[in-house]
A protein has these predicted regions:
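C-terminal substrate-recognition "lid" of short-chain dehydrogenase/reductases
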Residues: 8, 95-126, 131
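Residue(s) in the substrate-gating loop at a strand-loop-helix junction
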Residues: 16
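Active-site loop immediately N-terminal to the catalytic Tyr-X3-Lys motif
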Residues: 21-27, 49-50, 96, 114
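Short, small/polar-rich loop/turn modules that mediate ligand/substrate recognition or access, typified
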Residues: 48, 53, 119-121
């Protein structure tokens, strides 16, 4: 059965804080994430009366292998220390740290729950207040 046939469903799109604001030098990436958010909002309105919610999560920099590799690249190419390179990724988070993958997963889990039945068409920033 489809979500519409079941009159229940949860669609959670993975966007980024780049869907909420612009960033220099990554205009293509920002444009694609803005598109995800536009699709999320439009689809949420299309299925709002059919028991389906549609939301987007918008994480900031998450502590993943990709970020750790980027830190290593910054160190090797610039001579910065690891802490200096990491600061590039943590300075946009008022909490001064990377977002944990478990925090993103917990947000997705909540959006899938009955407790989030009235949450639809939203962009949920998971960035330690960086977009506040």
């Amino acid at each position: 059965n489809s979500m519409l046939d079941a009159n229940w469903g949860r669609i959670i799109n993975i966007a980024s804080v780049a869907s909420l604001r612009g960033f220099p030098y990554v205009s293509g990436y920002c444009a694609s994430k803005h598109a995800v958010l536009g699709m999320t909002r439009s689809l949420a309105l299309e299925v709002a009366t059919q028991g389906v919610t549609v939301n987007a999560i918008c994480p900031g920099y998450v502590d993943t292998d990709i970020v750790r590799t980027a830190v290593s690249e910054i160190v090797s190419k610039t001579g910065r220390t690891e802490n200096e390179a990491m600061q590039h990724f943590t300075e946009s988070n008022p909490q001064g740290r990377l977002v944990e993958a478990s925090e993103v997963a917990s947000t997705v889990s909540w959006l899938c729950s009955e407790g989030a039945a009235s949450v639809t068409g939203q962009a949920i920033a998971i960035d330690g207040g960086g977009t506040a």
